[in-house]
Amino acid sequence: MSQRLPQRIDLLAMADAGRTLEGRIEVTSLDRVLPLLHDTEGVLDVVMRMDRDPDGTRFVAGTIEGRIQLLCQRCLEPVVLPLNLAFRLGLVADQEEASRLTPRYEPLIVTAEPTRLADIVADEVLLAMPQVPVHPEQELSLIHI
């Protein structure tokens, strides 16, 4: 998977067309994640399928795979967080529509403006990150030998 993803897309049109995007996104494009990282090098593999379900709900379902490097708050050394994330987002226009969304989707409020793909990826990565990154106990003992 070496293809670069487009920066912005019309999610509603892509869902209506039943499109799938596969590619890589640079970690450096995840603006809200960058301040939380120890190292900003690397790429994440992303697959996003946009479609309508049998009820007519537009959605984005996908996966994000890769690794990010955080700072262990116990020893202040780098700690790698492997990412193997799956998500299902229902595309809605407002909070009222979001409240009617079935539980199988998390709401994503979209407008007529094209959506920045890096923002969707950043949201999912932020949700996967621990509040306090630390090495697992077995790794920590090896660091201090």
Report each predicted region and the residues it spans.
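A positional/architectural concept
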Residues: 1-69
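Cys/His/Pro-rich metal-binding microdomains
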Residues: 73, 141
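Cys/His-rich microdomains that often coordinate metals
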Residues: 79
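Short Cys/His-rich "knuckle" micro-motifs
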Residues: 82-85
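Short Fe-S-cluster ligation motifs
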Residues: 98-126
